[in-house]
Swiss-Prot record:
Membrane topology per record: Single-pass type I membrane protein
Protein name: Putative receptor like protein 25
The species this protein was found in: Arabidopsis thaliana
Stretches assigned to the Extracellular side: 1-178
Keyword RNA-binding: no
Amino acid sequence: MIYTKNAYGSISYTYQDFIDLRYKGLHMEQKRILTLYSAIDFSGNRLEGQIPESIGLLKALIALNLSNNAFIGNIPMSMANLIELESLDMSRNGLSGTIPQGLKTLSFLGYINVSHNQLKGEIPQGTQITGPPKSSFEGNAGLCGLPLEESCFGTKVPPIQQSKKEDNQEDAKVLNWKAVATGYGPGVFFGLAIAQIIASYKPEWLVKIIGPNKRRNH
């Protein structure tokens, strides 16, 4: 940044469109510096302290990776303001408290990983939060709710698909027994009625087939 002072005493600021970098022992000049950052990756840098609330001012941020550091404290509530965010990784830190409910309102958030922290409470129930696999939330002894199996009411949450499958099987069994009972009842009644008619009355066609009763002469 370069600043100049004019004759009237006011100061004006200008920014260079390049920067000198030294990367792996090599000197290079990076031109066309971006003034709008869309991705930040601070992973694996042993950073300490709390994540500042000012992180929520980066509303154009698309990807944020703070994994494998030593961040502590709560997840900033201001992260709900990152309306363009698509990927959020805060795994393997020392974060505590609950997951902000506002994160479930981030429409573009397709990936989130907060595993291996010290988070607790119920996971916000929203498509963006519960869509990822349970591995994205594991390693937090106090977390509960979907997609984890631990219920917030002290019991394990049964797998949804398995539960539906078992219910369908039970319904099928009930329907099969109802069908058997429905067919069995009228069938027995009809059979008994025919037997009674034959026993009490012999129609002509039946007499012709089996013949009239004849007494044997002794």
